[in-house]
UniProtKB/Swiss-Prot annotation:
A single BP term in Gene Ontology: protein refolding
Localization per record: Cytoplasm
Membrane-spanning ranges: none
Pfam families in the record: Cpn60_TCP1 (PF00118)
Quaternary structure, from the entry: Forms a cylinder of 14 subunits composed of two heptameric rings stacked back-to-back. Interacts with the co-chaperonin GroES.
HAMAP family: CH60
Protein role: Together with its co-chaperonin GroES, plays an essential role in assisting protein folding. The GroEL-GroES system forms a nano-cage that allows encapsulation of the non-native substrate proteins and provides a physical environment optimized to promote and accelerate protein folding.
Alphabetized GO MF terms: ATP binding; ATP-dependent protein folding chaperone; isomerase activity; unfolded protein binding
Alphabetized Gene3D superfamilies for the sequence: GroEL (3.50.7.10), GroEL-like equatorial domain (1.10.560.10), TCP-1-like chaperonin intermediate domain (3.30.260.10)
Record: residues binding ATP: 29-32, 86-90, 413, 478-480, 494
Lineage of source species: Bacteria, Bacillati, Actinomycetota, Actinomycetes, Mycobacteriales
Known EC number: 5.6.1.7
Origin species: Corynebacterium glutamicum (strain ATCC 13032 / DSM 20300 / JCM 1318 / BCRC 11384 / CCUG 27702 / LMG 3730 / NBRC 12168 / NCIMB 10025 / NRRL B-2784 / 534)
Protein name as catalogued: Chaperonin GroEL 1
The encoding gene: groEL1
């Protein structure tokens, strides 16, 4: 492939245009009075959403130099979403503002390396300030506030808070579509563990990047599955019965894995393979727990059950299983409540009888997994477009609520960042030259989220930012009521974890862009295609 190369100012300007294109599409959604964006989907109706990361994921630009910029900022949104699950719009905006500020200074002759030192120091300072301003979140009402701000929907806020209360702040909360138009919460028996799919080809729900299996056959295998002849007879039985299949084994490798991937791509069978979690005896014990939850029999040569002889009697099942990149959630396993309770009793006895603290901790962890239960929020709405939009909001709300419970909250509406920016301006005096410019660049960028929240509400952003800067910690502008006041009491709050990861990811990408001296892209394909056509004139 031929490449195109741009240097210096050209390279950076192309990147900036791409950054702006993506960020401008995302920033209209910011704040309680933010607007929606409509995404055209190849399948099904268009998606109307105000979820920053969903919009960002959908954007690819035609101009390859601009697309580099768009993809860089997209990575900020996606990364922030992975870590904190929310705050993607804020992260995107911060990155855009920092890149624009920084490039302006580079064009005016500032040294990018020195600028970066300033930005790094300012980012460190910002994170310290965020920690210092954090308030702990304890009661359900505060959690409901966080979830409400995130989803802009009080009903969702209350349901998410109720779910967190039932399963604890580390408990599993999943989102499903409801059959009715009501959104409701139910707590079901379920178990989850931190291992995801062995291959991304198993994903069957592209929106959530998960593999979702309804009423699947569950195959638990003690050892590795590495021989195809041993494994094929059982696989064929599943294909015949037309059921989805979840395989949990020490590992699935070589030909068996290839076979599963190929069949998954061809849609011959809905299948997901997952490595069993933990090691040694812990792995063994946990597999036995799973067997009881799903009513499966573990395929284990030690007890005389070989893979090549096993039939459908070894399968367990569950109502629904979702597998993401690093987590598997089994909801409503087929195991009877009595069996599961008996298993819990057995683990409780183990806890009582052991002298080792480590063993006790691990057994308690298993007990918690077995008794935790899983909260399922069933999302209902009148149309499919609305259901999809609401599902995204509920997922954001769950992530925000969990982040708040873990690391506390700060005043929302971008106000805490505006006030931290004031601290940075004073902090900048400790620096010289271009490093000072770098610290100030971040201070300017930190004002942008509040600016756009006010702008989207139809007010003059700069006036709001200037007034907010003078207010004490915890106070700021409430765009929902259009008044200034104590945001923490009004429930306008953001999880520290979300804002923290937004700042970290935005500054890291901005620093990369500022030090870019050349960009290399593939030459667009149309021209190449025409060139080939020229060879056929005999």
């Amino acid at each position: 492939m031929a490449k195109l190369i741009a240097f210096d100012q050209d390279a950076r300007e192309g990147i900036l245009r791409g950054v702006d294109a993506l960020a401008n599409a995302v920033k209209v959604t910011l704040g309680p009075r933010g607007r929606n964006v409509v995404l055209d989907k190849a399948f099904g109706g268009p998606l109307v959403t105000n979820d920053g990361v969903t919009i960002a994921r959908d954007i690819d630009l035609e101009d390859p130099f601009e697309n580099l910029g768009a993809q860089l900022v997209k990575s900020v949104a996606v990364k922030t979403n992975d870590i904190a699950g929310d705050g993607t719009t804020t992260a995107t905006l911060l990155a855009q503002a920092l890149i624009a500020e920084g490039l302006r200074n580079v064009a005016a002759g500032a040294n990018p390396m020195e600028l970066n030192k300033g930005i790094s120091a300012a980012a460190e300072k910002t994170l310290e300030e965020l920690k210092a301003r954090a308030t702990e979140v304890s009661d359900t009402k505060e959690i409901a506030n966080v979830a409400t701000v995130s989803s802009r929907d009080e009903v969702v806020g209350e349901i998410v808070a109720a779910a967190m209360e039932k399963v604890g702040k580390d408990g599993v909360v999943t989102v499903e579509e409801s059959q009715s138009i009501e959104t409701a919460l139910e707590v079901t028996e379920g178990i989850s563990f931190d291992k995801g799919y062995l291959s991304p080809y198993f994903i069957n729900d592209n929106d959530t990047q998960q593999a979702v299996l309804d009423n699947p056959a569950v195959l638990l295998v003690r050892n590795k599955i590495s021989s195809l002849p041993d494994f094929l007879p059982l696989l064929e039985k599943v294909v015949e019965s037309n059921r989805p299949l979840l395989i949990i084994a020490e590992d699935v490798e070589g030909e068996p894995l290839q076979t599963l991937v190929v069949n998954s791509i061809r849609k011959t069978i809905k299948v997901v393979a997952v490595k069993s979690p933990y090691f040694g005896d812990r792995r063994k014990a946990f597999m036995d727990d799973l067997a009881i939850v799903t009513k499966a029999t573990v395929v284990d040569p030690e007890v005389g059950i070989n893979l090549n002889e096993a039939g459908e009697e070894v399968f367990g099942t569950a109502r629904r299983i979702t597998v993401s990149k690093d987590e598997t959630i089994i909801v409503d396993g087929a195991g009877s409540a009595e069996d599961v309770e008996a298993r819990r009793g057995q683990i409780r006895r183990e806890i009582a009888n052991t002298d080792s603290t480590w063993d006790r901790e691990k057994a308690e962890e298993r007990l918690a997994k077995l008794s935790g239960g899983i909260a399922v929020i069933r999302v209902g709405a009148a149309t499919e477009t609305e259901v999809n939009d609401r599902k995204l909001r509920v997922e954001d709300a769950i992530n925000a609520a969990r982040a708040a419970a873990q690391e506390g909250v700060i005043a929302g509406g971008g106000s805490a960042l505006v006030q931290i920016a004031e601290t940075l301006k004073a902090y900048a005096e400790e620096f010289e030259g271009d490093q000072k410019v770098g610290v100030r660049a971040l201070a300017t960028a930190l004002g942008k989220p509040a600016y756009w929240i006010a702008s989207n509400a139809g007010l003059d952003g700069s006036v709001v930012v200037a007034r907010t800067a003078a207010l004490p910690n915890g106070e700021g502008f409430n765009a929902a009521t259009l008044e200034y006041g104590n945001l923490i009491n009004d429930g306008v709050i953001d999880p520290v974890k979300v804002t923290h990861s937004a700042v970290v990811n935005a500054t890291s990408v901005a620093r990369m862009v500022l030090t870019t001296e050349a960009s290399v892209v593939e030459k667009p394909a149309e021209e190449a295609a025409d060139a080939h056509a020229g060879h056929h004139h005999h």
